[in-house]
Amino acid sequence: MAHNEAVDVVHVVLVGAGIMSATLAVLLKELDPAISLEVVELMDSGAAESSNPWNNAGTGHAGLCELNYTPQAADGNVDIKKAVHINTQFEVSKQFWTYLTRKGTFGSSKSFIAPVPHLSFVQGEKGVSFLKKRFELMHQHHAFADMEYTEDKARMAEWMPLMMPGRPADEVIAATRVMNGTDVNFGALTNQLLKHLTSAPDTQVKYCKRVTGLKRNGSGWTVSIKDVNSGSSRDVDAKFVFLGAAGAALPLLQASGIEESKGFGGFPVSGQWLRCDNPEVVKHHQAKVYSQAAVGSPPMSVPHLTPVWSMARNPCLFGPYAGFTTKFLKHGSIMDLPLSVRAGNIGPMLAVARDNMDLTKYLISEVMQSMEQRLESLRRFYPEAKAEDWRLEVAGQRVQIIKKDPKKGGVLQFGTELVAAKDGSLAALLGASPGASVTVSIMLELIERCFPDKAKGEWATKLAEIFPAREKVLETDAALYRKINAQNNIALELVEESSETQSYA
């Protein structure tokens, strides 16, 4: 194997060319144009894994329709705090895209974001009772003031014309609608950010490169990188390393040996969709519609029927149907899971296996499903669905977080977690949903944790320019929320300037 003895030196190495690394790299260059960066990616293009539109159909997460973000307690109370927070996180993402759009970083923002109504749909007395309580609470908050609720089937036929024909006349159903939802093509956005990076000084984006080693080097790191085509290797010294490699972030984090990585494990879950390209079907469904997960199913199983506007012919996807594989990436190895087992995480992993038999049964049942059984699930949404219009499409991998827990030994965590070295020299992003939609908030958290002095000092003015309002104030200040939201919507071409009173999320 050829090895280059010369060691390259950069300020920052980012592993993985997805939305996380692309966002962090562009943000760092805005804060310090002199910073030197290298992005390394195993595949031959950016956004090849979780950021790819086929692998990430749950986009535009703003808490408008995703019912798992508003859980109902045993006493019947509905908690909307998470939905409010995710909504404001998405608004922070929009502030960053607005800033870049105004700078001319992108051509038209229409290439990656578009207005799409967000609907929630429920069945049965319990479902209707829950949705009504959820609406009554959310409608009072300024972020959801435009939400509509109905139990009227004629009105629902206007909102979701594909889903209403063929239903029993006495079926108990309800829906909410927010007209000003969005859909985001994170693949297109990622590639635009990466293209922008390649034109910046002291910045490189390199493909077909595998990180084979991470070693401490004083206050920084030596990153060993192998070219998967030629077999040659090189070392890069960096003051800061970000592991944004989707499911592959966990083994890389483990390879770093930092104390903060101890006890983390990963539980890989694969995804599948039913896909429809028939234009006669697709034209009748132009909204994201989310429902409730079946009793005993994990949050990742929340069913939804959604158009993918960013693709040719704008297909519809329904799902997700879960599966199990030991791969951490769609293009990964079946050895990913077994090789991630360590003395420090085997306890939490066994505890999760013990305490999550329902999840195990669910995944087995999903894997064993026939096409006809999958169509039965679809017909809850779309009663007149025809088998010949739909085909199975493989989606991306999700690696749910397993972490130590003082009481249970280990817990399975649905969400994202930023793990950072105590000295701020390395950080990794683990987990899944809401993921891409709140990327900017997560990267801001990383900057504040790993570069605290600069965030409060020399970068503070620029951060305030890019982000005039952060999550906490957006959650509580209705007037400011409406102002920021309106500015973002105009800049991102979600509304005409004369319509600026509308609130898009």
Swiss-Prot record:
The keyword Electron transport does not apply. It catalyses: (S)-malate + a quinone = a quinol + oxaloacetate. Keywords: FAD, Flavoprotein, Oxidoreductase, Tricarboxylic acid cycle. Transmembrane segments: none annotated. GO terms for biological process: tricarboxylic acid cycle. Pathway: Carbohydrate metabolism; tricarboxylic acid cycle; oxaloacetate from (S)-malate (quinone route): step 1/1. Its EC number is 1.1.5.4. InterPro entries: FAD/NAD-bd_sf, MQO. Its cofactor is FAD. It comes from the Bacteria. GO terms for molecular function: 2-hydroxyglutarate dehydrogenase activity; L-malate dehydrogenase (quinone) activity. The keyword Flavoprotein applies. PANTHER family: L-2-HYDROXYGLUTARATE DEHYDROGENASE, MITOCHONDRIAL. HAMAP family: MQO (MF_00212). Belongs to the MQO family. This is Probable malate:quinone oxidoreductase. It comes from Pseudomonas fluorescens. The gene is mqo.
